[in-house]
């Protein structure tokens, strides 16, 4: 946080700070009056008291200025930190989702059923019939079109992130689509730039905007050309239409309160998508702010706090060029939206007092203000003692002479008590702000961690079911049914397909093909000898049985393995022979969804590596100083950056993955409670004593992503079909140490509990 704050702009919107400022000004004026009265009425012996009052008044002025500036900085930092985290998390979720789309389009464009069918359409089926360019689909082509449509639908049924999948020939004519509707007028041939680029380019092409093939709203399309399986001539283009609007609303919904707006921008600040189109509509242009300094910006006559986040590449992919996310909060709502839970009141008194004793580590301004307030109270007390000791006594009956300074002493005592109450409340508020900021950070972090996990597992569940539809793998198993090993040609074909898949989807350590008896026939990364599922080995009996019993092509099974003490999960899907009557035009089957199981595909998901990468991206490791364990930042005048640990854990607390080393996998963190009772979608953050330290503890349970873990019917069917996704039961956990437990905190809390309460609140 930069040290310069636009105080005049921010201060009017901080009600609590303004109330404290008014009280402190009143206190300062009262001390000025006391000092003036003492100067007028003090005797020669009372000059020491006047000097002490001057020091007190000056100390109060410095304390007032420092306290207000600290409260202002803390409130501004909390607001900017929340906006920054939400903006960064939004672009991170989007980029990871779109990375999967680039792999999907590459996989499906190589599908041999699609390529063979497109070749037949273009070749006129070797019967001299007109090709696609001569006028589109005709009656003779209807069975082939139905075959293509069914094949596309079998893919889309497993990936609802796509609202349509289309096949275009080289002239831009739509040949088939997953979402075909009877009676719908076909779109005109496509001649758009992205389509022409797809025909000429080997890799995928992405396009966002209007398109004649999908009229209506702007679309995000991932396209890649299809090649003739024998001549390698370009046959057309496969188009995956991403359900962009629903995805953006899901990402925005996982962010902050309604008092702010989330945006997706291009590199020039043009709004592509908005969480509230009635507030800031797509097509608007907004100012951007990539730094963390508080710099209010004006848009459409309203002043906002703004944080913009650029994409960080994931697996080398950074999303469409220039895309970035931004969160904007109106200045008049940004601080009103800050929740002020009674953090200290909810804590055990001993923990609250211990945190104040450790404030230097997690909130240096709070530590400085508390020490300054103690110094002021000490000066006031010394002044009262000094004045009382200098009051002259009457020789008659030991009574004191009436002295003008006595009124000053009385005012000094009353004002000292009031000063203590006002500063106690202000410091209490600063303490609340510091702690609530960190608690909110942990809530936001854990919500992101679960969003990342569920989206990742959604992709894994869909990958295995997609690839089980691969015609080349089905053919290998069919042609070699009953053989002890694959022929050289079949082995080469299978391994080549598996290597191509693994090259597209790098999150897998290995992809293996096995027969109905569980014998692994081929795999990717065969040269990596230490990995499970090598050719010639067998799939675990329980996993094989679960895979064979899978109900249909929509079901899958997850197997948990122990690879040298490290967790590894294997996603299994069944490959099926074509069922009777499933063959369509020209003797080709489309997917083999309901036939008997002839084998399976196994995706070795390196759980620790991939989950650790997610944790490290969301909670990067901070360098720490030796004295306080807090990272130093010369540009940061707010809260120090304390090291934070993040985990994915089982409900019983066993660590499955950790952001940083130091804790053995499979171990539990003593003192962390409440994981088993987390409800779906619940997020918690609290302050606990753990391992001899005061710690912020955050945790969250998944709330589901699309149909993944949401549809109760699907969940029931999954149980019946032996689908057991153990990863889906994980929860996230974060831990941040604020400082060692203070030895005298409990005794101090007991003493303060019995102390006079001047402001109606527990003394701080």
Regions found by a protein language model. Give the residues of each.
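Extracytoplasmic/periplasmic sensory segments of membrane signal-transduction proteins
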Residues: 17, 27-200, 386-552, 615-618, ...
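Conserved long hydrophobic alpha-helices within structured protein cores
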Residues: 102-110, 219, 237-241, 298-308, ...
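Solvent-exposed, extracytoplasmic
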Residues: 147-159, 237-290, 331-358, 493-505, ...
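Extracytoplasmic/periplasmic ligand-binding sensor regions of membrane-associated signaling proteins
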Residues: 149, 154-247, 293-305, 500-614, ...
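Short, surface-exposed beta-strand-loop junctions and turns on beta-sheet-rich folds
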Residues: 181-183, 213, 278-280, 312, ...
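Extracellular/periplasmic juxtamembrane segments that couple receptor/chemosensory ectodomains to their
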Residues: 2-74, 284-437, 667-764
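Conserved beta-strand and immediately adjacent loop positions that scaffold enzyme active sites
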Residues: 104, 164, 220-223, 261-262, ...
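Intrinsically disordered, low-complexity domain-flanking/linker segments in eukaryotic proteins
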Residues: 126-133, 579-593, 622-634, 710-723
């Amino acid at each position: 946080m930069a040290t310069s704050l636009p105080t005049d702009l921010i201060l009017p919107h901080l009600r609590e700070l303004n109330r404290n400022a008014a009280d402190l000004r009143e206190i300062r004026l009262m001390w000025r009056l006391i000092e003036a009265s003492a100067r007028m009425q003090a005797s020669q012996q009372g000059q020491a008291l006047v000097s002490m009052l001057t020091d007190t008044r000056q100390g109060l002025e410095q304390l007032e200025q420092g306290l207000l500036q600290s409260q202002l900085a803390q409130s501004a930092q909390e607001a900017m930190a929340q906006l920054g985290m939400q903006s960064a998390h939004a672009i991170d979720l989007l980029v990871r989702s779109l990375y999967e789309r680039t792999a999907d389009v590459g996989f499906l464009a190589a599908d041999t059923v699609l390529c063979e069918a497109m070749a037949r359409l273009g070749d006129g089926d070797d019967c001299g019939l007109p090709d696609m360019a001569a006028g589109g689909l005709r009656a003779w082509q209807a069975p082939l079109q139905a075959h293509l449509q069914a094949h596309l639908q079998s893919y889309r049924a497993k990936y609802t992130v796509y609202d349509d999948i289309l096949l275009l020939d080289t002239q831009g004519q739509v040949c088939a689509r997953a979402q075909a509707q009877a009676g719908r007028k076909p779109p005109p041939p496509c001649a758009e730039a992205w389509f022409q680029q797809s025909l000429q380019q080997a890799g995928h092409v992405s396009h966002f905007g209007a398109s004649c093939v999908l009229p209506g709203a702007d679309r995000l399309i991932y396209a890649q050309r299809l090649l003739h399986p024998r001549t390698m001539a370009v046959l057309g283009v496969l188009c995956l239409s991403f359900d962009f609007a629903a995805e953006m609303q899901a990402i925005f919904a996982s962010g902050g309160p309604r008092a702010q707006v989330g945006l997706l921008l291009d590199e020039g600040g043009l709004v592509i998508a908005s969480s509230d189109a009635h507030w800031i509509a797509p097509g608007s242009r907004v100012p951007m702010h990539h730094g963390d300094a508080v710099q209010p910006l004006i848009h459409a006559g309203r002043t906002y706090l703004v944080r913009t986040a650029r994409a960080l590449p994931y697996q080398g992919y950074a999303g469409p060029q220039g895309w970035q996310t931004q969160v904007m909060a109106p200045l008049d709502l940004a601080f009103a939206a800050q929740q002020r839970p009674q953090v200290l009141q909810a804590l055990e008194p001993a923990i609250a007092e211990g945190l104040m004793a450790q404030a230097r580590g997690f909130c240096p301004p709070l530590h400085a203000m508390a020490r300054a307030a103690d110094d002021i109270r000490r000066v006031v007390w010394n002044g009262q003692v000094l004045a009382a000791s200098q009051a002259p006594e009457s020789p008659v009956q030991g009574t004191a002479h009436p002295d003008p300074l006595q009124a000053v002493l009385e005012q000094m005592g009353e004002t000292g008590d009031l000063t203590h109450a006002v500063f106690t409340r202000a410091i209490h508020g600063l303490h609340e702000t510091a702690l609530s900021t960190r608690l909110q950070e942990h809530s936001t972090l854990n919500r992101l961690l679960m969003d990342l996990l569920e989206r990742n597992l959604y992709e894994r569940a869909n990958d295995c079911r997609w690839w089980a539809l691969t015609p080349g793998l089905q053919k290998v198993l069919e042609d070699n049914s009953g053989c002890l090993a694959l022929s050289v040609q079949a082995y080469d074909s299978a391994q080549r397909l598996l290597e191509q898949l693994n090259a597209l989807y790098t999150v897998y350590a290995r992809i293996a093909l096995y027969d109905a008896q569980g014998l692994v026939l081929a795999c990717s990364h065969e040269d990596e000898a230490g990995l499970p599922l090598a050719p010639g080995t067998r799939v675990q009996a329980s996993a094989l049985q679960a895979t064979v019993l899978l109900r249909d092509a929509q079901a899958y099974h997850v197997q948990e393995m122990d690879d040298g003490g490290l967790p590894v999960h294997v996603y299994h899907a069944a490959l099926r022979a074509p069922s009777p009557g499933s063959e369509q035009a020209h003797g080709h089957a489309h997917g083999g969804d309901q036939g008997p199981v002839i084998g399976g595909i196994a995706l070795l998901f390196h759980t620790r590596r991939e989950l650790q990468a997610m944790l490290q991206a969301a909670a990067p490791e901070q360098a720490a100083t030796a004295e306080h364990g807090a990272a130093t930042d010369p540009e940061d005048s707010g809260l120090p950056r304390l090291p934070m640990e993040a985990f994915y854990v089982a409900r019983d607390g066993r660590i499955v993955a950790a952001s940083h080393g130091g804790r053995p996998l499979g171990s539990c963190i003593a003192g962390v409670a409440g994981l088993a009772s987390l409800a779906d979608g619940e997020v918690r953050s609290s302050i606990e004593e753990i391992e001899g330290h005061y710690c912020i503890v955050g945790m969250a349970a998944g709330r589901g992503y699309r149909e993944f873990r949401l549809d109760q019917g699907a969940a029931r069917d999954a149980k019946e079909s032996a689908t057991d996704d153990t990863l889906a039961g994980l929860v996230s956990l974060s831990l941040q140490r604020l400082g060692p437990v203070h030895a005298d905190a409990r005794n101090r809390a007991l003493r303060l509990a019995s102390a006079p309460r001047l402001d109606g609140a527990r003394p701080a």
